[in-house]
Amino acid sequence: MKPLVALVGRPNVGKSTLFNRLLGHRRAIVDDTPGVTRDRNYALINRFEKPFILIDTGGFEPVTEDRLLQQMREQSSLAMEEADVIIFMMDARSGLTPADVEVANMLRRVKKPVMYVVNKVDGEKLENDSAEFYSLGVENLYTISAEHNRGVYDLMDDLLELLPLDSGPESGEEITRIAVVGRPNVGKSSLVNRLLGFERVVANPTAGTTRDSVDTLFMCNKKPYLLIDTAGIRRKGKTTEKLEKYSVVDALRSIERADVVLVVLDATQGVTEQDERIAGYVHEAGRACVFVLNKWDAIEKDNSTFGLYVDKVRTGFKYLAYAPIVFVSAMTGQRTAKVMESVDEVMEQFSRRVTTSDLNRVFSEATSSHHAPLAHGRRVKFYFATQVTTRPPCFVVFTNQPDSIHFSYERYLINQFREAFGFNGTPLRIIFRGREKNSPSRRPVKDS
């Protein structure tokens, strides 16, 4: 495991701005509204001599009656427990506050390196005023402007000296990236917390509690995973608030980053138009998919209930008919272990490669038993097929009519490959290509 560095401090002191600065691009949502970052957000920072994992946290308020702020404080405390080094950030514009003093007193009891940072030092006056922070009794105080990149590299030089050696996973071990997506308030964060075994993400009945896409590294059955809990995706017309628009874009980017996407559905509401839209994003991105039908405990059941709900999902998502369906209750934990089993199964298929000889055997049988429709009155000839990539598996089929293959025949070939090679939980892609004139002569597949 690479060393962990936690950013902690009051709300709106610039933790997410520094997080994005060190990452090299915007990942955490940055806004003037306090409490925009509500959970622990992880990112691998590999732009410096020593790679490390940076944890961005929600604001830390030592004393509060607000339940959401209490949950954010708990998330910050967990981040401090996980971290090898803590960066405690304060705000030069606000000056030293009683909350800063409370956090500093708590950090004195932490037996790990703490770096005290005053952010938003954007001019000489603020530089002079920041001297008051020395009253905390610290020897080294870093004055920076994360927004303008002032003092950040000096901070990084000293941080790298404090980092322990990487005790990371064995070489060659790959991390499966899992995105959790769905409409607001279908139970995504509750599912994440259930899978991880502790409250990793702020789960709240209020729709939109998760605003950032929150990354969590974890181990399951001795295998590493990166779990991405996304903000709920709403209809475009309903994302009027600026932060909501940021979050939807971030959720779509999370789908692009993932290997496997868990599409969480609410069993009590059935399949909605917005569910179909979200699943469409997953399909277009070409990611492996598992449908997680949550709140199954709230459904009254008889012998036909299971089959009826399977039919509802299959009817609503015809283009994802290959994706497995898991019925769970994130609240009670019912069948949630099946989720990771399904992730492993579809990931194996998502990464599977078949030999060219086996592929062409199936390809020849498929084109011989069912001929392609004529294209512009001409017979379609197929020459051979080869797999060019995985994740998702992609095949190139060479033919004399690459631009005239009917989509129904493409679907037929995909289904033949799926059945023959066990690609039951992953999208498949076929590219039709003409023979290059300079390539060796090849005979068409027999009887096609």
Swiss-Prot record:
GO molecular function: GTP binding; ribosome binding
Record-linked Pfam families: KH_dom-like (PF14714), MMR_HSR1 (PF01926)
UniProt domain KH-like: residue ranges: 352-436
The species this protein was found in: Pelobacter propionicus (strain DSM 2379 / NBRC 103807 / OttBd1)
PROSITE patterns from the UniProt entry: G_ENGA
Any one GO biological process: ribosome biogenesis
Similarity comment text for this entry: Belongs to the TRAFAC class TrmE-Era-EngA-EngB-Septin-like GTPase superfamily. EngA (Der) GTPase family.
NCBIfam families: GTPase_EngA, small_GTP
Keywords for this protein: GTP-binding, Nucleotide-binding, Repeat, Ribosome biogenesis
Protein name: GTPase Der
InterPro entries reported in the protein's UniProt record: G_ENGA, GTP-bd, GTPase_Der, KH_dom-like, KH_dom-like_a/b, P-loop_NTPase, Small_GTP-bd
